[in-house]
Amino acid sequence: MSENVMTLQVITPAGVVYDHHANYITARTTNGEIGILPNMISTITGLEIDELKVSRPDDETHVDYIAVNGGIIEIKDSLVTIVADSAERNRDIDVSRAERAKIRAEKALEVAKAEKKSDEIKRVEVALHRALNRLNVSSHN
Amino acid sequence: MGASLNEIKTKIASTKKTSQITGAMQMVSAAKLQKAESHAKAFQTYAEKVRKITTDLVSSDNEPAKNPMMIKREVKKTGYLVITSDRGLVGSYNSNILKSVISNIRKRHTNESEYTILALGGTGADFFKARNVKVSYVLRGLSDQPTFEEVRAIVTEAVEEYQAEEFDELYVCYNHHVNSLVSEARMEKMLPISFDEKGDEKASLVTFELEPDRETILNQLLPQYAESMIYGSIVDAKTAEHAAGMTAMRTATDNAHSVINDLTIQYNRARQASITQEITEIVAGASAL
């Protein structure tokens, strides 16, 4: 194993979603986008609901996309661990299910806005954001 | 030889049918158990990682914890999250857990206002309602392999009530799955979160770059940690439920088989007796001639 490689593990309650070597990762944290290279300083930070871009050492041109629903990222000794409520690789995403989730969330958002429930609006917006994120990631196929 | 031949025959037939049903239910439970076990295994890796990150984050901090989820408050009210099954036919699974909860509550509390119960599963909810114990939250109809999304409602509810100081500590009561024959009732303290009991874990010397700052990350991580621990016990309890169902159904099938054996012997004896009687009657009739 060369020096300039790190390991990325994405773990959810349903099991390990992604476990591969990587030489470059981009992620959107609560503080903005970060790029992660091997041997980076140990860091712990929160993630936004967004996509994760991973370029692997075995294929320079190929990029893996992973939809992550929030969670925490820990970087330590070239081991990058992401724990999230849920996460999906682009090839595993069920597009029709994500479409349906999006439509459902949009409808619920209208209802919530009509009833002016601020908590509900916030929750539905997060759900909508997740669905859009999944659709966005799946479009990278 | 009270029963007639026909009566015994119908009894045998109906017991046979029952044993077929329980046999099928045993196999269904066995399949579910296997699935639940692999699910629990997958979840274990997640729980370990969350725990590791949390300890990494907390151990590098020398100041006393400021996060509300870690501060030990004076205990005025205790919350119990009791996990039971929705349906019966699981042997002593439900009675085990409910008995241990009731005895624990009696030991610890003198007044009803000192505790509140969150019930997961219909049996537990009905049990407490029948005894006029206040149940503050009920979740029924959990699927056999509960997803994180499904249980999020009750988990978030528990965490929110804790944060709103509805109760000052939270225990989760469930049956821990040891193997397919053994499970044990457990009561675990989930909130406030403490890491004291894991004193053997070496505090990592690595200092972490924290963005934006410790408090913000803790605010995000600790609820996730608590949720994952509670979800872990639910998965564990479900596994135990399937195991209990399987064992109960196996016992039922075995019992049915022994009942059928006894009945068959009884049937044969009755048949024999009637034949003997018939012969005696014929012989007696012939000799009378």
UniProtKB/Swiss-Prot annotation, chain A:
Membrane association type: Peripheral membrane protein
GO cellular component terms, A-Z: plasma membrane; proton-transporting ATP synthase complex
Transmembrane annotation, as ranges: none
UniProt keywords, alphabetically: ATP synthesis, Cell membrane, CF(1), Hydrogen ion transport, Ion transport, Membrane, Transport
Cell compartment(s), UniProt: Cell membrane
GO molecular function, one term: proton-transporting ATP synthase activity, rotational mechanism
Predominant localisation class: membrane
Pfam families: ATP-synt_DE, ATP-synt_DE_N
Stored CDD domains: F1-ATPase_delta
Subunit text: F-type ATPases have 2 components, CF(1) - the catalytic core - and CF(0) - the membrane proton channel. CF(1) has five subunits: alpha(3), beta(3), gamma(1), delta(1), epsilon(1). CF(0) has three main subunits: a, b and c.
Family per record: Belongs to the ATPase epsilon chain family.
Function statement: Produces ATP from ADP in the presence of a proton gradient across the membrane.
PANTHER family: ATP SYNTHASE DELTA/EPSILON CHAIN (PTHR13822), ATP SYNTHASE EPSILON CHAIN, CHLOROPLASTIC (PTHR13822:SF10)
Name of the featured protein: ATP synthase epsilon chain
Biological source species: Lactococcus lactis subsp. cremoris (strain MG1363)
Swiss-Prot record, chain B:
Superkingdom of the organism of origin: Bacteria
Matches recorded under NCBIfam families: ATPsyn_F1gamma, PRK05621.2-1
InterPro entries recorded: ATP_synth_F1_ATPase_gsu, ATP_synth_F1_gsu, ATP_synth_F1_gsu_CS
Assembly behavior: F-type ATPases have 2 components, CF(1) - the catalytic core - and CF(0) - the membrane proton channel. CF(1) has five subunits: alpha(3), beta(3), gamma(1), delta(1), epsilon(1). CF(0) has three main subunits: a, b and c.
UniProt-listed HAMAP family: ATP_synth_gamma_bact
Membrane topology: Peripheral membrane protein
Protein name: ATP synthase gamma chain
Gene from which this protein is expressed: atpG
Gene Ontology CC entries for this record: plasma membrane; proton-transporting ATP synthase complex
GO biological process, one term: proton motive force-driven plasma membrane ATP synthesis
Disulfide bond annotation, renumbered to this chain: none
Role, per record: Produces ATP from ADP in the presence of a proton gradient across the membrane. The gamma chain is believed to be important in regulating ATPase activity and the flow of protons through the CF(0) complex.
Family membership noted in the UniProt record: Belongs to the ATPase gamma chain family.
Molecular function terms from GO: ATP binding; proton-transporting ATP synthase activity, rotational mechanism
Pfam family, one: ATP-synt
Main localization category: membrane
Location of the protein in the cell: Cell membrane
Keyword Repeat appears in the UniProt entry: no
Stretches that traverse the bilayer: none
Alphabetically ordered keywords of this record: ATP synthesis, Cell membrane, CF(1), Hydrogen ion transport, Ion transport, Membrane, Transport
